[in-house]
Structures are given as C-alpha cells and as structure tokens.
From Swiss-Prot:
It comes from Dictyostelium discoideum. GO terms for biological process: sorocarp development. The lineage of its organism: Eukaryota, Amoebozoa, Evosea, Eumycetozoa, Dictyostelia. Belongs to the hssA/B family. Pfam families: Coiled (PF05710). This is HssA/B-like protein 23.
Length: 93
C-alpha cells in the first residue's frame, strides 16, 4: 500500500508531491540515519529490505538529502515506531 504525501518548500528546494512514498521497491523515499532521499528520482532495491527502504539512484535525478519532518511509512498504523523523528523536509531539484 502506498500513501500520498506533499513535500513542503525548504529553501530553494521546490515543492513536490509523490504517490510512491514508503519503503517498497518502487518507493521515492529512502530511509536511513533519519534522512531520506526523496522525489521521483528512482532507486534500487536494498538487501536490508524494509529496514531502510530503497537506495537512491543518483543517476536517475538530483536527490536532496534533508532530515525529514514527519514521514509516515505505510506500516505506521501497525508499527508507530516506523515514523521518523522531526527535522526538516525534502525534495528533488
């Protein structure tokens, strides 16, 4: 299941939205170290699976690594701890 999230403007990073937010294979989000790589930038599956989600494919677009504000994973309803801490926002240039 995917969730739809809107991305707020931070500095010169443009606002955007995505329907593929989450930790699945086609996710636009990569989890790890309380940061995410976000935007329609593609990615590749990660051996660690749902633990950190997909790995950003830098060849598919410019990815901005910025602390996430509140990113809710598709599994957050069953596992509230999958919500990342407050920080900032994200986007792709």
């Amino acid at each position: 299941m995917t969730i739809i999230a809107s991305i707020s403007k931070i500095g010169n990073i443009k606002s955007s939205s995505s329907s593929s937010i989450g930790s699945g294979r086609n996710s636009a989000i990569s989890f790890g170290s309380n940061k995410i790589a976000c935007g329609e930038c593609g990615g590749s599956s990660n051996p660690m699976g749902s633990l950190i989600g997909n790995v950003a494919n830098t060849g598919a677009g410019k990815v901005s690594h910025i602390p996430v504000t509140v990113m809710v994973d598709a599994s957050v309803a069953m596992n509230p701890s999958s919500m990342l801490p407050s920080g900032g926002s994200c986007g792709c240039n």
